[in-house]
Curated annotation (Swiss-Prot):
Belongs to the glycosyl hydrolase 20 family. Pfam families: Glyco_hydro_20, Glycohydro_20b2. It comes from the Eukaryota. Residues 1-15 form the signal peptide. It is found in: Lysosome. It catalyses: Hydrolysis of terminal non-reducing N-acetyl-D-hexosamine residues in N-acetyl-beta-D-hexosaminides. This is Beta-hexosaminidase A. InterPro entries: Beta_hexosaminidase_sua/sub, Glyco_hydro_20_cat, Glycoside_hydrolase_SF, Hex-like_dom2, HEX_eukaryotic_N. Responsible for the degradation of GM2 gangliosides, and a variety of other molecules containing terminal N-acetyl hexosamines. Degrades chitotriose. Keywords: Glycoprotein, Glycosidase, Hydrolase, Lysosome, Signal. The active site is at residue 322. Its EC number is 3.2.1.52.
């Protein structure tokens, strides 16, 4: 009896210390992100591999749905490393009905992802307007499937679900300039994105450190700017990523940051300004575009035409952040630039020179043959005169309240916004930062689950201008070896915030049993998903392939 009492006392003390319950408390057949409306039935249905099928109806030739059926039937519905039972008594057919035709290209902004899913003991029925909605429904259905340890059987919960996303933009930003990311690693993140119902990959392709994008028209860019000839993405590589993303209902938005963060563009002669230190000596690292040279704008026009031919998405991210970090060295101390400013009547006002550059860039974007809606980081709004057609990408704010004030200010000027400031996942501290405020970090760099981009005092018109959010993972200390575990499941907190109803997702303590089940589900599917709720375990843990004999 004494041992039992001590054990109970120790367990409850741990629960208090970690701020959570027992480490095996997870939901069973819980859906992540939480649907708009879900009603569970009272019965479960045993599933066996030989008695389950998918009926695509009149869309049986649609490549998106065929890939979906293959992925779920052969990998994701039955992910656990257990012997599959066969010989069920009745077939279980998943019937998929999609109203619109199978699209030939990737999803477009605002495409419907709404679906209705009904699961009974005899069948499952999916109804969706688009194939993208059907993809989301199938992922939800897979969350209803669980492995019962006692009966050693796969079962599915019966349920009726109506669902659609809260925001049209729900994404991840990856940075392949600071550290090159392989195609396989990028594809793995796309798979996990689809399992979290995220639909935008913001690809920060180039930055000061390297230029891995292969330009067919201007091969000198990657020829000089890439880390090595191996650290590049060919047009075929990019097309492969876009095609892979499409089959999972994900758009790919490229970013080419201008006019700063451009050291790696050094292969283009005359594109960058000369920069000088306090003694007037030229520095080795120019990092701003030379706005004096009209040939640079001709080059950008041709270069961006090529980019739009490579990336089909209607959004194009053109950066615009942190220009002020380089202005003194590269513009103020540059005598040629100062003379140009005098000739233009700008005096000492470098903001006017920035405006000059951006006006030229806006004109280039407006004249693109394949029309694009530009996205800019928020400095272009804060310091300059943004094109009225622009989307403003918010990355600043030390608290959630400061972030909300930024959103309020920008939307009050009638600009649509995308929010990333809440979810900078490259910042790491010890603890469950998805739900807790972590000591030593700004609140915006923790408590990811609690950031709601529309939690500001504004009009409905303003709140409708909030397109959604993108969780960012900057690459200074992130590469192929750690991006997956660092992203997931922390990005899953943002995924639920951007998909699910705000009023139903107010408390992380109510969400973490579902997140625990999500983590274990993804681990069983073969992904490196780090612990997120302090001490816990999964029924089937992640494992590496066995060592070869030579390693023993």
């Amino acid at each position: 009896m004494r041992l039992i009492v001590l054990s109970l006392l120790f367990t409850s003390t741990l629960a208090w210390f970690y701020g959570r319950d027992e480490p095996d408390r997870w939901s069973v057949g819980g859906v992540w992100p939480l649907p708009q409306k879900i009603i569970y039935g009272s019965k479960n249905r045993t599933l066996t591999y030989d008695k389950i099928g998918i009926d695509l109806g009149d869309k049986k030739d649609c490549d998106v749905l065929l890939a979906m059926a293959d992925n779920y039937m052969n990998k994701w519905l039955f992910p656990y490393p257990v012997e599959m039972k066969t010989g069920g008594t009745e077939d279980f057919i998943i019937t998929v009905t999609v109203k619109e035709e199978c699209p030939g290209g990737p999803p477009v902004h605002g495409a419907s992802e709404e679906y209705l899913l009904r699961v009974s003991v005899s069948e499952a029925v999916i109804n969706a307007q688009t194939v993208w909605g059907a993809l989301r429904a199938m992922e939800t259905l897979s969350h209803l499937v669980f492995y019962d340890q006692k009966s050693q059987e796969y079962q599915i919960r019966t349920a009726e679900i109506f669902d659609k996303p809260r925001f049209p933009v729900r994404g991840i930003m990856i940075d392949s300039s600071r550290h090159f990311l392989s195609l396989n690693v990028i594809k793995r993140q796309l798979e996990i994105m689809s399992m979290n119902k995220l639909n935008v990959l913001h690809w920060h392709l180039v930055d000061s450190e390297s230029f891995p994008y292969t330009s067919q028209k201007f091969p000198e860019l990657h020829g000089v700017g890439a880390y090595s000839p191996r650290h590049v993405y060919s047009r075929e590589d990019i097309s492969e990523v876009i095609a892979f993303a499409r089959l999972r209902g994900i758009r790919v938005i490229p970013e080419f940051d201008l006019p700063g963060h451009t050291s790696s563009w050094k292969g283009r002669k005359g594109f960058l300004t000369e920069c000088f230190d306090e003694k007037g000596e030229e520095t080795f690292l120019p990092n701003l575009v030379d706005p004096m040279n009209d040939a640079n704008f001709d080059f950008l026009a041709e270069f961006l035409e090529e980019v739009t031919e490579t990336f089909p998405d209607q959004f194009l991210h053109l950066g615009g952040d942190e220009v002020s970090d380089y202005i003194v060295e590269c513009w103020v101390r540059n005598k040629k630039i100062r003379k140009f400013m005098d000739e233009k009547g700008f005096g000492n006002n470098t903001v006017l020179l920035e405006n000059y550059f951006f006006e030229k860039l806006f004109s280039i974007v407006e004249k693109l043959k394949l029309k694009r809606k530009p996205i800019f980081w928020q400095e272009v709004f804060d310091n300059n005169i943004p094109d009225p057609n622009s989307i403003i990408h918010i990355w600043k704010g030390n608290t959630h309240e400061e972030i909300y004030e930024q959103v309020k200010n920008i939307t009050s000027k009638n600009f649509p916004v995308i929010v990333s400031a809440c979810w900078y996942l490259n910042y790491i501290k010890y603890g469950a930062d998805w739900r807790d405020e972590i000591r030593g970090t700004a609140p915006s760099n923790s408590r990811y689950y609690y950031c709601d981009p529309t939690s500001f005092n504004g009009t409905d018109t303003q709140k409708n201008l909030v397109l959604g959010g993108i969780a960012a993972i900057w690459g200074e200390l992130v590469d192929n070896t750690n991006i997956e575990a660092r992203l997931w499941p922390r990005a899953s907190a943002a995924a639920e915030r951007l998909w699910s109803p705000a009023e139903k997702t107010q408390k992380a303590e109510n969400a973490w049993p579902r997140m625990h089940e999500l983590r274990c589900r993804l681990v069983s599917r073969g992904y490196r998903i780090q612990p997120n709720n302090n001490p816990d375990y999964c029924p089937f843990e992640f494992d590496e392939p066995p060592a070869t004999k030579s390693e023993l």
